[in-house]
Amino acid sequence: YEPFPEEVIRQMASRIADLHFAPTDVNKQALLKENIDNDKIYVVGNTVIDALFCLSEDVISQAKKFYEENNIEINDKLILITAHRRENHGERIDRIINAISYLAKKYDDHIFVIPVHPNPNVKEKFYSRLSDLKNIKLLKPLDYPYLVYLMKNAKLILTDSGGIQEEAPSFACPTLVMRYETERKEGIEVGVSKLVGADYDKIVAEAEKILTKDISQTRL
């Protein structure tokens, strides 16, 4: 199952659940295909997006101040990157890092901001391979408002995160999903997101389609 372990857990829980609260009609249709009774499914909206729009301007201003104090310039050439999925450990994370390194060197006028997951399988590789590149900013895991501020201002997002896949379309930010399977289909269906897996060539090719343009041309 991918994504792992979430999809396994969801499948197990679905077998015994009496009620199913689906964020969207797309999710409801997926449950119906799994032979869940229609009268057990309720479309209730997405609480992740609710939380996103509950952030106050004061909180967003604090996030802006955080980056200013840490000498991280947030401009229209910002790329946000997150990668931590268990299924991407090993050779996959190596290919992802190779792609990031290539892009950062070629587009050295862009800023690549990477909140690094504390898992040693991820952290050690990111710091050993990317810390010498001046336009890559490796950060500790960010508080939620600080991450939202980056999404709001990013020219491009590269991620294997489930949550960011849900949130990025709210900002119309082009997003490359570094997975081979995703349970979040909505962003892909509306054209904001694209599956690229951990494929070096696909990551580079799709990123370059965005990075060669002005942000005003890429916001969807």
PLM segments and residue spans:
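Nucleotide-activated sugar donor-binding and catalytic core shared by glycosyltransferases
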Residues: 1-114, 119-220
